[in-house]
Amino acid sequence: MTEFQGYLELDRSWQHDLLYPLIFREYIYTFVHDHGLNRNKSNLLENVGYDNKSSLLIVKRLISRMYQQNHLIISANDSNQNPVFGYNKFFFSQMISEGFAVVVEIPFSLRLVSSLKGTELVKYYNLQSIHSTFPFFEDKFPHLNYVSDVLIPYPIHLEILVQTLRYWVKDVSSLHLLRLFLHEYYSWNRFRIPKKSISFFSKSNPRFFLFLYNSYVCEYESILLFLRNQSSHLRLTSSEGFFERIYFYGKMKHPVKEVFADDFPTNLWFFQDLVIHYVRYQGKSILASKDMPLLMNKWKFYLVHLWQCHFYVWSQAGSISINQLSKHAFGFLGYLSSMRINLSVVRSQMLENSFLMDNAMKKIDTLISISPLIGSLAKMKFCNVVGQPLSKSTWADLSDFDIIDRFARICRNLFHYYSGASKKKSLYRVKYILRLSCVKTLARKHKSTVRTFLKRLGSELLDEFFTEEEEVLSLIFPRTYSTLRRLYKGRIWYLDIFCINDLVNYE
């Protein structure tokens, strides 16, 4: 992002004029294509040259035509090529929206960095790894009692997205252009695929979609943080929350004020939240607390009223369940986490007297849910739905080295990601599926049977599937039963993981 800011010479004063780089800095569209900002690389973007799709004259003409009335009318002829430009209108609006997302992301990122500098999170870059939340669970969750898994509602109304952005983007013309993009996408998708408009929107224009989603989540979490910070000041003087971003908070002079009178039969006292933890991941969030369910119920109604009153998204309090960690397990990023109580007896002796003490220690168990893993492997044609390995026919044309390397990389990354699991028995089943699928793919390529190919190849293929920790331990210790048992039970956290893409990238 710093590189783009240097090229565009964009600082915070450009919040009042965001259309200037979009119209007069045409190399933005080259950045979108050449720097891999558009991860969903369509055939159009790969086959069309820069001179044909990103000239300044075409961009200016297209923006002018977008404001004409006949351009917004969706008809059956829109799928054909435009006689003026040579491509359909949706392609050009997608191109400009990608450039628009790049320009607007810069002040958005500056706002995020400036907000983080004002907090105690000095090394905020450590939060980039989503896998770093698991050590947090190990340290904090044994001391917590209740957890709630919340699905962040989305999508919201298009106009609410524009109103959310207008509080920090002061360029009115950019907001009008954003509104035009949103309504055009909505009209286009409603005409072509009415049931999967959001899915189509996110796949056809991922950068633009992620920018809108991140702005929505940033606004939602800023209000949530505001409520959390102000909750400690509301004990003596009751206050009323106004869900307006400009005039958000108002003090009440009288000591007690009924808040949400239609939903609560008695006066509601705000009180300080001693322990409340919030974690967000992949469109979901987790709320955890040590206190009684009263605190969790209060924040559950906070969230419901926030979504309904501010973002106009329908949500029900009954859809947010509050579970006790000692009795219920919850799924998180492919793990199945639960609370385990380790009982032990400690003998204590003081002078001539001795007595026994029962000691109970809480520990988080992170297990691997094998069913989603088998489902992902079956979807990518590595096995069938019951886990029987299959040959990967689409990779049969590759070289032997590439085939083995791809299978081994997927296996190592899965072990890398699930290294923090308490038990790794399910991972060894996945390794068996990938290893046998690799052998079947090679045998299919060489038109041989699996048995014959294994005899000719020997045990060299097995070495490619050793994981990183297995290689290190094999150099230090002999491969005995005790070593494998420690490896099976050991928990090694790798904090450099962003995502697992190998099952998808090669398709």
From Swiss-Prot:
Keyword Transmembrane: no
The UniProt record lists the keyword RNA-binding: yes
GO molecular function, one term: RNA binding
Pfam families noted in UniProt: Intron_maturas2, MatK_N
Top-rank lineage group of the source organism: Eukaryota
Cellular component per GO, a single term: chloroplast
GO biological process: mRNA processing; RNA splicing; tRNA processing
Keyword set, alphabetical order: Chloroplast, mRNA processing, Plastid, RNA-binding, tRNA processing
Cellular compartments annotated: Plastid, Chloroplast
Broad class of where this protein is predominantly found: plastid
Family membership: Belongs to the intron maturase 2 family. MatK subfamily.
HAMAP family: MatK
Function summary: Usually encoded in the trnK tRNA gene intron. Probably assists in splicing its own and other chloroplast group II introns.
Protein name, UniProt field: Maturase K
Protein species of origin: Cannabis sativa (Hemp)
Lineage, opening ranks: Eukaryota, Viridiplantae, Streptophyta, Embryophyta, Tracheophyta
